[in-house]
Amino acid sequence: MIDSRKNRLRRELRVLVERWLLPALIAALPWWIGFRIARRLAHRPWFFRERVEATLAIAQRYGVVDDPARFAFEQRLYHLVDHVDLFLLKWRSDRYLDRHFDIDGDWPAGDGALIALSFHWGAGFWALRSLRRGGRRFAGLSVRTDPDSFAGQALLHRYALLRNAEVIRTGAHDLVYIGDGPRPMLRALQAGTCLLTSIDVPGVGGEMPVRLLDRDAQLPSGMIKLAEKAQVPIVFFAVWLDPATGRRKLRIREPLHVTDREAAMHFAASHLDWMLRAVPAAWHFWAYADAFFLQAQSAATRLDLEDQQSA
């Protein structure tokens, strides 16, 4: 019982420091100061230690790590900045974001529904504000945040709720829950609401074969099928940062109209392949790589609580 209580307190303290206190402090400071602090923290091996060490070991098996120390630094930096961005999105204006944000490409003109699709890579929160500024409402897709599954992890549960609330506020629409099936998603699209999601989620079913990093792999095809049925375009996007300055870049791909599912899946895979080759340390889901690269049954793979967030 004593060990259990001690471990629980240790987990809560880690969440308090890594997801609340330090990210909020960095977000409250002028960016040139805040990011300097973020870089210093990212050089500390104790920061996100368990997650980064596990990620590094898996990524090395897939041959994407040239410099382990650099990879670990960038992993820690992306984890930290991802949490900082929640507070920046809550507290900072569009004008502030524009000073630190470059955009390559444009969201499609008009206000018609689309599926904005990415992967758990980089620091994508700022893309939400960009999409909303284009005049579109969107609903983030999410797993349900079950309080019982967060037993003994109150701060992590509150963090997940805060993150979901920010997606709702920015998108001006409630979340749509993956577990409710495709009908709520289809209704949202038919009502002119965009969907925002990532497709590198293991264990959801409907996987189709693709090639990633010159290996056989698989990715879920549900969003591709949904876009085809709803006759709405898919727009792939990615957000990453300059690790030296913290400046972000949003890449918006041309709209993809699904007429051939296999071709659409290959397009999705090529987008992820580019991400993994460009900045492999930016992928937050290396822990689930074996499920995608056919080294494990994806149906048996479940998201860790720390990854059950809508964006």
Describe the role of every protein-language-model region.
Residues 1-2, 311:
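Non-catalytic N-terminal targeting/anchoring module and adjacent flexible stem/linker
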Residues 2-124, 161-166:
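Membrane-anchoring hydrophobic helices of lipid-metabolizing enzymes
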Residues 43, 114-115, 172, 209-212, ...:
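Short, contiguous strand/loop micro-motifs
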Residues 51, 123, 159-160, 181, ...:
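Residue-level preference for nonpolar/small residues embedded in alpha-helices
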Residues 56, 128, 165, 224, ...:
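Short glycine-/small-residue-rich flexible loop motifs, especially phosphate/cofactor-binding loops
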Residues 75, 112-177:
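Catalytic core of membrane glycerolipid acyltransferases/transacylases, capturing the structured
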Residues 98-104, 172-179, 256-257:
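Short acidic-hydrophobic, aromatic-tinged amphipathic segments that line or gate anion-handling sites
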Residues 108, 133, 137, 177-311:
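Non-catalytic C-terminal accessory region of glycerolipid acyltransferases
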